[in-house]
Amino acid sequence: GVDHFHDVHTMSHKDVAMLARSVELDIAVDLGGFTQNSRTEIFAMSAAPIQISYIGYLGTMGANYYDYLVADQTIIPEKNQKYYSEKIVYLPSYQVNDSKELPPEITFTRKELGLPEKGVIFCCFKLSTLF
């Protein structure tokens, strides 16, 4: 859980950085990096004493205002650390999911899901707000 939630999506980059400082945020984690609609400007203004890049962009941010980048040995082998401006924090798997802990087998019939008994079903599990 969290103690406080601030909806900042309509705030300017500067106002978000100032808010983060005013609430004495300890660590800011950038989940977007150099991707569409990211807000790296907030990190450039030092929103928190410790700033981390994780999951959304797997390359170096190449900026002195990012302290750490979270990865695994597959994403960034130790021999390649020299190409990153950030210190690398290694996890066993940089993704929060892994293939070692499989979910329990749950099966549904097409009828239970309101689907026709025959035919092809297309699915997209993409975040609809990505663009």
State where each predicted segment sits.
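Conserved catalytic-core segment of nucleotide-activated headgroup transferases in glycan assembly
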Residues: 93-131
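Conserved nucleotide-cofactor-binding alpha/beta core module
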Residues: 1-63, 74-81
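Residues at the C-termini of beta-strands that transition into short coil/loop
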Residues: 9, 55, 72-73, 92-95, ...
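Short, surface-exposed amphipathic charged segments that create phosphate/polyanion-binding patches used
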Residues: 20-23, 65-69, 86, 105-107
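Beta-sheet entry/capping signal
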Residues: 4, 27, 50, 67-68, ...
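Residue-level preference for short coil/turn positions at secondary-structure junctions
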Residues: 47, 84, 116-118
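Donor nucleotide-sugar binding/catalytic pocket of nucleotide-sugar-dependent glycosyltransferases
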Residues: 67-79, 84-99
